[in-house]
Curated annotation (Swiss-Prot):
It is a peripheral membrane protein. InterPro entries: ATP_F1_dsu/esu_C_sf (IPR036794), ATP_synth_F1_dsu/esu (IPR001469), ATP_synth_F1_dsu/esu_N (IPR020546), ATP_synth_F1_esu_C (IPR020547), ATPsynth_dsu/esu_N (IPR036771). This is ATP synthase epsilon chain. The lineage of its organism: Bacteria, Bacillati, Bacillota, Bacilli, Lactobacillales. It comes from the Bacteria. Belongs to the ATPase epsilon chain family. The keyword Cell membrane applies.
Length: 139
């Protein structure tokens, strides 16, 4: 494999492509096992993603994308992220994310009182997604 100084990063969801850049110097994702930094010429990898931000670095700038689950596949200097949902920082509706956070917190309280574990798990995931969107919007 020839040495290369950049990566290509693509983020897709069931609704279509969210992000595409072929001049990336570093990709940072949070997997179920922890944070993973990918530089050009990294060994091939496939990993399940956590609900968290994805950071895409190029030259002196960094793009931040809220990713809610999925996986990353990297080989031959191309990273493809297939996510359940993903939003660019500039596309996040903060008021909507704050509202979703409040709804999830209320649902968690109700589920705890009712001892409804399945509803509790769903609400906890919704809360993590809302917090992720809020955090990414602040970058």
């Amino acid at each position: 494999m020839a040495e290369n100084s950049v990566l290509t990063v693509s983020i897709v969801t069931p609704d279509g492509q969210v992000y595409d850049d072929d001049q990336v110097t570093m990709l940072v994702v949070n997997t179920k096992e922890g944070e993973l930094g990918i530089l050009p010429n990294h060994v091939p990898v496939i990993a399940a993603l956590a609900i968290d931000e994805v950071r895409v670095k190029h030259s002196q700038e960094e793009d931040v994308i809220a990713v809610n689950g999925g996986f990353v596949e990297f080989s031959e200097n191309t990273a493809t992220i297939v996510a359940d949902t993903a939003e660019n920082q500039s596309d996040i509706d903060v008021a909507r994310a704050e509202s979703a956070k409040k709804r999830a917190e209320a649902t968690i309280r109700k589920a705890q009182q009712a001892h409804d574990n399945s509803e509790l798990r769903r609400a906890q995931i919704s809360l993590r997604r809302a917090i992720n969107r809020i955090n990414v919007s602040k970058h």
